[in-house]
């Protein structure tokens, strides 16, 4: 799927589900890592993570588009477009837009460091490096040591 097909898909879904036209751009952004898509407030564009399409197919992209279109149409209408707003919750439920998308990588796959407690030997896996002089074990307050670097 390319950006032109994505643009047409967004325009069609906007007409079908919301009864309103989508007048801005929708495109894939390969720099998105932890989110399925995002609605840009200043430009009103919608960005979609291409990895979602590669991993889960067109059905997942449709769900992400519906979610982002909820943000889009509510923001354009001047209503509450944030996840916490009742307008957003109501509209997303009406059109069947999910609150979350499937994650591409689990936390375990993204982890770079493995630590252990010197006292109780509890294991901690982290994406970012931890300052072992400041951080302590959450179970017994023991000292942490790096066991290995995973990547």
UniProtKB/Swiss-Prot annotation:
Keywords: Cytoplasm, Metal-binding, Zinc. GO terms for cellular component: cytoplasm. It comes from the Bacteria. GO terms for biological process: response to stress. The active site is at residue 68. Pfam families: SprT-like (PF10263), Zn_ribbon_SprT (PF17283). It is found in: Cytoplasm. InterPro entries: SprT-like_domain (IPR006640), SprT_Zn_ribbon (IPR035240), Uncharacterised_SprT-like (IPR023524). Its cofactor is Zn(2+). Residues 6-147 form the SprT-like domain. Zn(2+) binds at residues 67, 71. Binds 1 zinc ion. GO terms for molecular function: zinc ion binding. Its main location: cytoplasm. NCBIfam families: PRK04351.1. Belongs to the SprT family. This is Protein SprT-like. It comes from Staphylococcus aureus (strain NCTC 8325 / PS 47). The lineage of its organism: Bacteria, Bacillati, Bacillota, Bacilli, Bacillales.
């Amino acid at each position: 799927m390319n950006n032109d097909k994505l643009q047409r898909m967004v325009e069609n879904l906007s007409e079908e589900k919301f009864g309103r036209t989508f007048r801005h751009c929708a495109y894939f952004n390969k720099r998105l890592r932890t989110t399925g898509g995002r609605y840009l407030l200043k430009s009103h564009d919608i960005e979609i993570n291409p990895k979602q399409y590669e991993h889960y197919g067109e059905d997942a992209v449709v769900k992400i588009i519906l979610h982002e279109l909820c943000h889009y149409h509510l923001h354009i209408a001047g209503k509450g477009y944030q996840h916490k707003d009742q307008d957003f919750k109501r509209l997303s439920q009406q059109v069947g837009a999910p609150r979350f998308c499937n994650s591409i990588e689990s936390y375990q796959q993204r982890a770079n460091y493995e630590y252990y407690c010197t006292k109780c030997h509890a294991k901690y896996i982290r994406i970012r490096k931890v300052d072992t002089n400041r951080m302590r074990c959450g179970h017994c307050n023991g000292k942490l040591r790096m066991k290995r670097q995973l990547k």
